[in-house]
Amino acid sequence: MESWLLRRGARVRCLHPPSWLPAWCFLCLLPVPQTLQLTGLVSLTHTSLPIMVSLANTDVFFSCRIEDFTRLQRDLPVKLFHTDIHGRRRWEKQINCQHRPGMENHTRDCMVKLSQANTSATGIYYFIVEGEETYQSDGVVILVRDTVYQPPAFKVQEALMLGFTSLMSVLGVLGTALLLWKKKQISVLGKHTAKTCSGLKSTVGTTKPPAESVYTSLQRRETEVYACMKEETGSPVFSQSPATKEKLNRFEDDNEFNLVYENL
């Protein structure tokens, strides 16, 4: 019975292995596909800025790092090519890279120097590693300017705004001056009108009537005298000034003289 249980347990252990066995088997099989995957694998990494701006006639530096995971003692050729802003490839050349000491994965650093770059150097630069397969890095954008920063030119809108503001200021000043001049003219005209009316009223009593016949003058003389005196002062005859009374006496003397002349 015990032997049968042992045999059954062995069968069970064979059919259902312990939990550590699948993990051990997996670890044994793991290096096989990994070795196959790393065969010919090369990594290119930029160690400089992805976008660079420089002035003309100055040197531009940028670099990349190449990592060869194949663990093979080989120096893969590295090339650099340039494309312009329209995407056309301009040139391609091979560059030299330096190995890092003490690195097992044979890492190399590649430094590129563009001497006295001008505006034609503007574009995108790519690194290429040629081996069993061709590997290409991401592009480095380099913008070369032939002039320094200049402030924007005087815009037309700003000129129009300035002209409109100046015109409105001038019109405001002219309008204010015109209003002040008009007010002054109105005040002067009012004073002149008042002076003219007072002068006309003062000359009513001293104006001599036109030459008429003796009878007509005798009929209208007294009425005109009283009407003139009333218009000037608006008061009765007895309240007139001495000058007015003197004028009245003079008119009465004239009436008596005309009466004597008529009797003659």
Swiss-Prot record:
Classification via PANTHER family: NFAT ACTIVATION MOLECULE 1 (PTHR35680:SF1)
Bilayer disposition of the protein: Single-pass type I membrane protein
GO biological processes: B cell differentiation; B cell receptor signaling pathway; calcineurin-NFAT signaling cascade; intracellular signal transduction; positive regulation of B cell receptor signaling pathway; positive regulation of cytokine production; regulation of B cell differentiation; signal transduction
Job description of the protein: May function in immune system as a receptor which activates via the calcineurin/NFAT-signaling pathway the downstream cytokine gene promoters. Activates the transcription of IL-13 and TNF-alpha promoters. May be involved in the regulation of B-cell, but not T-cell, development.
Domains as described in the record: The ITAM domain displays no close similarity to any existing ITAMs, except for four conserved positions. The phosphorylated ITAM domain binds ZAP70 and SYK.
Domain of life assignment: Eukaryota
UniProt keyword Transmembrane present: yes
Lineage: Eukaryota, Metazoa, Chordata, Craniata, Vertebrata
Glycosylation site residues: N105, N118
GO molecular function: transmembrane signaling receptor activity
Subunit text: No direct interaction with the B-cell antigen receptor (BCR). Interacts with SYK; probably involved in BCR signaling. Interacts with ZAP70.
One cellular-component annotation, GO: plasma membrane
Chain ranges of the ITAM domain: 212-232
Post-translational changes noted in the entry: N-glycosylated.
Any coiled-coil regions, as ranges: none
Topological domain ranges for the Cytoplasmic compartment: 181-264
Tissue: Highly expressed in the spleen, expressed by both B- and CD4+ and CD8+ T-cells, as well as non-T- and non-B-cells, including macrophages and neutrophils. Expressed at low levels, if any, in non-immune tissue.
Signal peptide range: 1-37
Positions of the Ig-like V-type domain: 49-145
Stretches that traverse the bilayer: 160-180
Keywords from the UniProt entry: Cell membrane, Disulfide bond, Glycoprotein, Immunoglobulin domain, Membrane, Phosphoprotein, Signal, Transmembrane, Transmembrane helix
Post-translational modification Phosphotyrosine, affected residues: Y215, Y226
Cystine pairs: C64-C110
Protein name as it appears in the record: NFAT activation molecule 1
